[in-house]
Amino acid sequence: MKTRDKILYKSLELFNELGEPNVTTLLISDELEISPGNLYYHFKSKTEILTEIFGWFENEMYQLLESPNSGSDIEDQWFFLHLIFENIAKYRFIYKDVVNVLERYEEIKLRFQKIILKKREASLKILSNLQEEGSLQANDGEVEALCEHIVLTATFWLNYKLISQGELTEDVLSQGVYQVISLVAPFLDAGQREQLNELKAAYL
């Protein structure tokens, strides 16, 4: 692996483990056992490192959100949401310290806001399809409210679990998916609710 890539992957690891504000370029170079000058040759500042890693997150998230599953099978939506939560966990430092990070990096703040809007659009597309197919018994106002709650839960789920448990366990992603779908459950038809119960038994 090239030194530049090693710097990025080690930085992501340290950001996730320690939190972005607690990671310096000196720490990154020490962890990689390279000189600060070598790191500086590839990246002039931590901001450059953070911006590139955010670009990874951004590209991966957009790939997921550009093509949400439009079918009416609740299991398909379960796995789609699981992929979203996996992406959030992979770059969890962004979500764990989201207010602090976004306040200090204006460019990233604007890009993250666009991702939030895209999450909402994807949620609306899925719910609207379920609504049109008769699987979701909700009016347009309820669908709009559900979209807000879905994005809110997905965005802050890891923070909630860290605060309540002190650590992230292996089943935290499936729990997050279930919490999101549970928001929709009261509006699902009987068949979809039964399938949701089966998924809960299988994955939680």
Each PLM stretch: what is its role?
Residues 66-93:
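Hydrophobic alpha-helical connector segments
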Residues 88-110, 125-129:
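Amphipathic alpha-helical segments used for helix-helix packing
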Residues 55-61:
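Short, basic, alpha-helical segments at the C-terminal edge of helix-turn-helix-like DNA-binding modules
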Residues 3-10, 146:
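N-terminal positioning helix adjacent to the helix-turn-helix/winged-helix DNA-binding module
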Residues 163-204:
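C-terminal peripheral helix-coil segments that are non-catalytic and often amphipathic
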Residues 6, 14-48, 52:
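Helix-turn-helix
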Residues 65-69, 95-102, 130, 134, ...:
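Secondary-structure edge/capping motif, primarily at the C-terminal ends of alpha-helices
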Residues 107-133, 144-159, 175-186:
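Amphipathic alpha-helical packing segments from all-alpha helical-bundle domains
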